[in-house]
């Protein structure tokens, strides 16, 4: 069993999603958004750090998964996003959580099957995969999708390791 915290970083809205993985079964534990309504960036970063720390304390995740920075057309926006990611990662590292990063295209490909999927498609698939009664908020759905991606990637890595071990022992032909 593992609890995974997914984070969709943003300087104004940071989505989070928490799921439990038992074997191949995924279950929803919680999700939402950390909203920073103050104007100055240092105060927003402080709120993101405090919010992520509180979520970690509440859910006690085993793994922390976050979306990688994409190349934005606006350099200022990309820098602010990078800083928001940074404080979220520091919150995880301060709690000694292993951090995993996933590209947005990889997350969409894993959850929807199309790397260029729309937000509404991600929301629908997250709802379906986690058997939720309604679509989660867009940023929370993205965070849940990041957590789901971590489960799939780590499960595939474990299966590959087991196959290599069996091959080394001469069990696969």
UniProtKB/Swiss-Prot annotation:
Positions of Mg(2+) 1 binding: 8, 139
Catalytic activity, reaction form: Endonucleolytic cleavage at a junction such as a reciprocal single-stranded crossover between two homologous DNA duplexes (Holliday junction)
Matching InterPro entries: RNaseH-like_sf, RNaseH_sf, X-over_junc_endoDNase_Mg_BS, X-over_junc_endoDNase_RuvC
Compartment(s) where it occurs, according to its Swiss-Prot or TrEMBL record: Cytoplasm
PROSITE patterns listed in its UniProt record: RUVC (PS01321)
Top class in the EC scheme: hydrolase
Matches recorded under SUPFAM superfamilies: Ribonuclease H-like (SSF53098)
Mechanisms controlling activity: RuvA inhibits the RuvC resolution reaction by binding junction DNA and preventing cleavage. RuvA binds to cruciform DNA in the presence of RuvC.
Molecular function as annotated in GO: crossover junction DNA endonuclease activity; DNA binding; magnesium ion binding
Chief place of localization: cytoplasm
Residues the record lists as binding Mg(2+) 2: 67
Gene Ontology BP term (one): recombinational repair
Positions annotated as active site in the UniProt record: 8, 67, 139
Effect recorded for residue 139 to H: Loss of HJ cleavage in Mg(2+), poor cleavage with Mn(2+)
Domain notes from UniProt: Each subunit has a cleft approximately 20-25 Angstroms wide and 20 Angstroms deep, which is sufficient to accommodate dsDNA. Residues thought to be catalytically important (Asp-8, Glu-67, Asp-139 and Asp-142) line this cleft.
Function: The RuvA-RuvB-RuvC complex processes Holliday junctions during genetic recombination and DNA repair. Endonuclease that resolves Holliday junction (HJ) intermediates. Cleaves cruciform DNA by making single-stranded nicks across the junction at symmetrical positions within the homologous arms, leaving a 5'-phosphate and a 3'-hydroxyl group; requires a central core of homology in the junction. The consensus cleavage sequence is 5'-(A/T)TT(C>G/A)-3'. Cleavage occurs on the 3'-side of the TT dinucleotide at the point of strand exchange, although there is some flexibility in the position cleaved. An in vitro resolvase system that forms and processes HJ has been reconstituted with DNA substrates, RuvA, RuvB and RuvC. RuvA-RuvB increases the rate of strand exchange (branch migration), dissociates the RecA filament and allows RuvC to cleave in both orientations at the cruciform junction. HJ-RuvA-RuvB-RuvC complexes resolve Holliday junctions and also undergo branch migration, providing evidence for a coupled branch migration/HJ resolution reaction.
Remaining remarks: The dual incision reaction has defined structure and sequence requirements which must be satisfied for efficient nuclease activity. These requirements are biologically important since they serve as a control mechanism that prohibits the nuclease from cutting DNA at structures that could bear a physical resemblance to a Holliday structure.
Family under the similarity heading: Belongs to the RuvC family.
Stated name of the protein: Crossover junction endodeoxyribonuclease RuvC
Species per Swiss-Prot/TrEMBL record: Escherichia coli (strain K12)
């Amino acid at each position: 069993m593992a609890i995974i915290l997914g984070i969709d970083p943003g300087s104004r809205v940071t989505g989070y999603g928490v799921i439990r993985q038992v074997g191949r079964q995924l279950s929803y534990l919680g999700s939402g958004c950390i909203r920073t309504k103050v104007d100055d960036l240092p105060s927003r970063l402080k709120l993101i750090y405090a919010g992520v720390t509180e979520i970690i304390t509440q859910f006690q995740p085993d793994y922390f998964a976050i979306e990688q920075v994409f190349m934005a057309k606006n350099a200022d926006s990309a820098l602010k996003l990078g800083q928001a990611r940074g404080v979220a990662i520091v919150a995880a590292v301060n709690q000694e959580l292993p951090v995993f990063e996933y590209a947005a295209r990889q997350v969409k490909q894993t959850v929807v099957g199309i790397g260029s999927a729309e937000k509404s498609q991600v929301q629908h698939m997250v709802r379906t995969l986690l058997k939720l009664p309604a679509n989660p908020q867009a940023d929370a759905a993205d965070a849940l999708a990041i957590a789901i991606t971590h489960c799939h990637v780590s499960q595939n890595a474990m299966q590959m390791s087991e196959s290599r071990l069996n091959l080394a022992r001469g069990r696969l032909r």
